[in-house]
Amino acid sequence: MYQKMNKEKKLSANTPSGFVDRYGKELALKENLIAKIEENFLKFGFSKLETPSFEISENIGKFLPDEDRPSSGVFGFQEENNSWISLRYDLTAPLARYVSQNYLNISNPFKRYQIGNVWRNEKPGPGRFREFTQADCDIVGSSNPLADAEMCNLLADTLNFCGLEKNQYQIKLSNRKLIQGLIENLKILESKQQLTVLRAYR
């Protein structure tokens, strides 16, 4: 029976565009790098958080173009009750949802890190995948500039710990208030255009 089905329709021996397999030395290198990153995050006093791969589409922070489709940029699925869920686009939206859901039970400031796969329904290209691993670290609930300084120190220390020299990387700072001021000054009112500007300055 199986042989008959196999003759009728052969499986495609290719991964979908923008997705890759990893095996052997390449996978071992990735896992070793993740282990070093995690070790350094813990050294700085951050706690690990794990969230689902799926989030309610509205919580992803995208804008639905119409009632019948999920937004572009994410892999969305419609459930039987007509609600939408999406594979997480990054690890920031799940953090915001978690903090909102558990704000009475978490420490303040809340120092957490998360390392996991994210998915983007975008055109793939060289070095640009539709599934990749992201390492995210945040301090939530502190307006003290020392928190920003700690994040810069953490990033530099982690890159050094992973084997990079100081002249091999740059740390660039951004402030959403400045970007928001640019959007207001340019009088960009349409939500999708605002999102494009925000992405350009990431």
Each PLM stretch: what is its role?
Residues 2-202:
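Extended, charged alpha-beta segments that form solvent-exposed binding/catalytic grooves
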